[in-house]
């Protein structure tokens, strides 16, 4: 069975990162804070998918990523392959362009992130490292 390739990005600004709250009605990972992103379409490369998802979900322009992936998760049971990058290289005013997917978005400090219900609790280590860099 082929894994569904999923890409996501952690948008950063000084001392804060952007997270999206997945709507409670979502089938996968409802009612948790997660990174903006989505599925790579057939024939699409991961970076183009990442740029498309940022534009669709947040109305911002992703100009690049800060090096290699900061997180990689493969879940054979759900046939998912998730790759996450971080980026300070984006522009535009971020807003929630798809409220049916995310019922809220927000900028958070490391202390605030520690109090959130994340899609995966192990994300906290990565997020703290990014904000301390």
Language-model features: locations:
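A short coil-to-beta-strand element that immediately follows conserved catalytic motifs
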Residues: 60-70, 85
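Conserved N-terminal beta-strand and adjoining loop/helix that marks the start
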Residues: 1-18, 39, 70
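Nudix hydrolase/Nudix homology domain
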Residues: 26, 89, 99-133
């Amino acid at each position: 069975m082929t894994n569904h390739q999923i890409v996501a990005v952690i948008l950063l600004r000084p001392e804060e990162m952007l997270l999206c709250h997945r709507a409670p009605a979502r089938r996968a990972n409802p009612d948790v804070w997660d990174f903006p992103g989505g599925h790579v379409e057939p024939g699409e490369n991961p970076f183009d998918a990442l740029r498309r998802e940022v534009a669709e979900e947040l109305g911002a322009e992703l100009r690049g990523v800060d090096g290699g992936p900061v997180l990689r998760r493969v879940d054979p049971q759900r046939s998912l392959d998730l790759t996450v990058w971080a980026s300070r290289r984006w522009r535009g005013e971020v807003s929630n362009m798809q409220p049916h997917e995310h019922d809220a978005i927000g900028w958070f400090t490391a202390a605030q992130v520690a109090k959130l219900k994340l899609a995966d609790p192990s994300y906290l280590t990565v997020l703290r490292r990014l904000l301390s860099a």
